[in-house]
């Protein structure tokens, strides 16, 4: 059975591009347009990995990560999280995002736009790491 990846991003073009890249490698992809929908899909779909944008309406990526630290979500803690952020941010903002992401137990960090091979490499590493746990 193919590994399932939940992609949460409010930009439909990013969602389509990431879905196409991942599906081309045989992954099953589930999408969500905001953090609220992302958490609902996390419960319903039980993915092997979550790719999560930081800046979204309703509930952003930080709020999702904070919510996942609540004991009610403990059975989902083994699911790796790959954070996406915009490369257009200034360096100090990116550093803040990275440090905050590490505090929130995020597994990896990738700037948009990303090369397909970079995305696939990071996804592969996170899924392998999860298998070892």
Which role fits each region the language model picked out?
Residues 121-133:
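The C-terminal output helix
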Residues 40, 62-75:
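Short amphipathic alpha-helix used as the core "switch/output" element in two-component signaling
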Residues 9, 53, 85:
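Active-site residues of response regulator receiver
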Residues 16-24:
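Charged docking surfaces used in two-component/phosphorelay signaling
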Residues 31-40, 61:
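Helix N-cap/capping motif at the beta->alpha junctions
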């Amino acid at each position: 059975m193919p590994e399932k990846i939940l992609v949460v991003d409010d930009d439909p073009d990013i969602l389509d591009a990431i879905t196409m890249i991942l599906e081309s490698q045989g992954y099953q992809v589930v999408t969500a347009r905001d953090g609220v929908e992302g958490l609902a899909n996390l419960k319903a779909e039980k993915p092997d990995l979550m790719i999560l944008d930081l800046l979204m309406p309703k509930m952003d990526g930080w709020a999702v990560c904070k919510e996942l630290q609540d004991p009610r979500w403990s059975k989902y803690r083994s699911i790796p999280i790959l954070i996406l952020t915009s490369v257009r941010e200034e360096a100090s903002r990116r550093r803040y995002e990275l440090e905050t992401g590490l505090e929130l137990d995020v597994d990896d960090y990738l700037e948009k736009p990303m090369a397909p091979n970079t995305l696939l490499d990071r996804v592969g590493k996170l899924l392998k790491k999860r298998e070892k746990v």
